[in-house]
């Protein structure tokens, strides 16, 4: 169900998202404190002629973790190698990647919490000592040799920082949480993306899209592209507030960015479970979703809105959620 318009996961439709990504900190909107700190750390590393400390970026999907990794590599003036936790199946895969890095290069591992344990253990000496421990032979004659690696920077990204093991988490010198974006920041992102796409847009239309983008740049850019279609077919190609509203209504994205999936989740809690509490697994089975997807994709925005509460006994719909649907809160 993550092919929905306001889904935060990267989809095939987002393959051209790269063209909209900022390449320098000067182009990057939002995450001000994270950005300012990273600029200091990068400048210090360059002055000392050292590799930047390993960086962990965590937070909901679609907030720009991959984009930040690209900017860090660009600002350092080094190469960026991108992979993901599930793609590194065995220690040899990681060893091949590490030995092909250049000095001070950046290795970006998305979904780093999904690394298997044997691969993760290879990372420990690589991160700490820039070395690779390799076992040669088997049984009593087996011996370990240590290979020196280039001094590199690992940037790990995850939506689930709590699933990282302590030994891995403790080896990151820089740990940053990315927060959902404000409407004002998203409005700036929409206008910047519109310029890149050569689409004219009113300030009020950009704000309309931003208000319904769930605090997420990826969602804002995806909505912008669909509204561009409506402007092209229904009008002269220029996005007005009226065109934006017409398109968003047709796409069933409401005034605060909820779509049919969100409404189904909230109404299930309200109607089927009396407002809650309801356990995560039970709720997931009811709406046909995975528990992880509810936690990582749907809940961050609903929590930010104050529409649900997480309690030890399960999820509960709040008074604000009832009021949004015009229901009486009891």
Swiss-Prot record:
Residues 1-181 are annotated as: Large ATPase domain (RuvB-L). GO terms for cellular component: cytoplasm; Holliday junction resolvase complex. DNA binds at residues 310, 315. ATP binds at residues 20-21, 62, 65-67, 128-130, 171, 181, 218. It comes from the Bacteria. Has 3 domains, the large (RuvB-L) and small ATPase (RuvB-S) domains and the C-terminal head (RuvB-H) domain. The head domain binds DNA, while the ATPase domains jointly bind ATP, ADP or are empty depending on the state of the subunit in the translocation cycle. During a single DNA translocation step the structure of each domain remains the same, but their relative positions change. The RuvA-RuvB-RuvC complex processes Holliday junction (HJ) DNA during genetic recombination and DNA repair, while the RuvA-RuvB complex plays an important role in the rescue of blocked DNA replication forks via replication fork reversal (RFR). RuvA specifically binds to HJ cruciform DNA, conferring on it an open structure. The RuvB hexamer acts as an ATP-dependent pump, pulling dsDNA into and through the RuvAB complex. RuvB forms 2 homohexamers on either side of HJ DNA bound by 1 or 2 RuvA tetramers; 4 subunits per hexamer contact DNA at a time. Homohexamer. Forms an RuvA(8)-RuvB(12)-Holliday junction (HJ) complex. HJ DNA is sandwiched between 2 RuvA tetramers; dsDNA enters through RuvA and exits via RuvB. An RuvB hexamer assembles on each DNA strand where it exits the tetramer. Each RuvB hexamer is contacted by two RuvA subunits (via domain III) on 2 adjacent RuvB subunits; this complex drives branch migration. In the full resolvosome a probable DNA-RuvA(4)-RuvB(12)-RuvC(2) complex forms which resolves the HJ. This is Holliday junction branch migration complex subunit RuvB.
């Amino acid at each position: 169900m993550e092919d929905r318009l306001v889904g935060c996961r990267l989809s095939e439709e987002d393959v051209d998202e790269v063209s909209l990504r900022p390449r320098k900190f000067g182009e990057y909107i939002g995450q001000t404190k994270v950005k300012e700190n990273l600029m200091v750390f990068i400048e210090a590393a360059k002055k000392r002629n050292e590799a930047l400390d390993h960086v962990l970026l965590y937070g909901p999907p679609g907030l720009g973790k991959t984009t930040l990794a690209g900017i860090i590599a660009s600002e350092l003036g080094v190469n960026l190698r991108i992979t993901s936790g599930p793609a590194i199946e065995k220690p040899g895969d990681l060893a091949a990647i590490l030995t092909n890095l250049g000095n001070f290069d950046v290795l970006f591992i998305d979904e780093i919490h999904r690394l298997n344990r044997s691969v993760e253990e290879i990372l420990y000496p690589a991160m700490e000592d820039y070395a690779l421990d390799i076992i040669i032979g088997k049984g009593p004659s087996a011996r370990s040799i240590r290979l020196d690696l280039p001094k590199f920077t690992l940037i790990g990204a995850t939506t689930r920082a709590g699933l990282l093991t302590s030994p891995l988490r403790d080896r990151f010198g820089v740990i940053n949480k990315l927060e959902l974006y404000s409407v004002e920041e998203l409005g700036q992102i929409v206008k910047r993306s519109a310029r890149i796409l050569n689409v004219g847009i009113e300030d009020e239309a950009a704000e309309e899209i931003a208000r319904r983008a769930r605090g997420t740049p990826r969602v804002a850019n995806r909505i912008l592209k669909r509204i561009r279609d409506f402007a092209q077919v229904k009008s002269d190609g220029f996005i007005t507030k009226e065109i934006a509203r017409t398109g968003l209504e047709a796409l069933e994205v409401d005034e605060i960015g909820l779509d049919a999936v969100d409404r189904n989740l909230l109404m299930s809690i309200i109607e089927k479970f009396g407002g809650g509490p309801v356990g995560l697994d039970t709720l997931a089975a009811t709406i046909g979703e995975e528990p992880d997807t509810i936690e990582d994709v749907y809940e961050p925005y609903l929590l930010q809105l104050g529409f649900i509460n997480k309690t030890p006994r399960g999820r509960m719909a709040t008074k604000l959620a009832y009021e949004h649907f015009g229901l009486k809160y009891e």
